[in-house]
């Protein structure tokens, strides 16, 4: 008790001693202010600053002696700022992007004829009049350009596709950023056509995938598009090249083409999975005009998911095949086995011998929203918008005497009952549109 009383007494004396200098400075300051008129303005300011500085120093010294941390206030500010930065960073990491993709852009000769102008050039913009507003809503748009562009080769449709260079202007203007060239028609204008087609795409301001024209396949980087802070890897593969690969060297085949070699695909998809936030694969395989995928398709596409693919946009059959969701590690992945045709001259009127002829004029516009949160990217929503190619007689003829048609792709949401363009359709077209819309939704069966 005596020791505690003695300690309290010493602390009080210490506190009195600490207050003494402060009170003394205060008294002197009062005395100064009473007599400040005796000083010049300059001298007054200098002395005032000295007095304030001494007062602040003594106050801080007194607080330090009493055990009050001199930096407590600034530490709190730093801590709050750090917390704010963490919250801001977390918020910045929560981002979403919308990806759209469609199937074959298949330019048959009748489409060229209609696009030909009097001056000998071509204009394909009207093909995408009703598609463009949809594509412009997306952050990344991917199409499958099934053919080549080679000005040193004759124009052609089936079986050797080679389109005028102007197609790329229209495709770019519609909103596409990436075009898949891994398909069975990429050699239709020889190995030179691989390079000229990729070059035409790049000159139009887009990116080709599925061919390698700058570096050999085994040395080329994975194509990754950063969209709103999300890195999207893009890979594409083809089952074959219509036998034309037999007429090119093994070196050209290995260096420039992207086939379904499982060892190579596995390595590339695994690499993409490490380098990007989400991986999109566009394989071309299956049986033409068949509405269901083969067992080979199912097995391989599921392997791709196992290797690291998140989204698989399939193609080749020229008709739409169903979609499927696959759960992996608690997250849903997306497969659509075939997106069908998005623009072509294949239809009921031209494919009368084909059992599924009506399906060749139909396709889907895949509409997928991906979300990145806290470093993890997942598929948030996925939709398959039915599409249909309308072919309307223009009432005019080509110089060779062929009838000309207006080819336009419709996103059927806009043309069914209640759609903004419904009133433009005649009764026969309304029935065709409504049937296509209903059958397509049932067939694709995508419920996310």
Summary of predicted features, one role per range:
Residues 2, 11-15, 20-36, 41-448:
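Acidic, metal/ion-coordinating pockets
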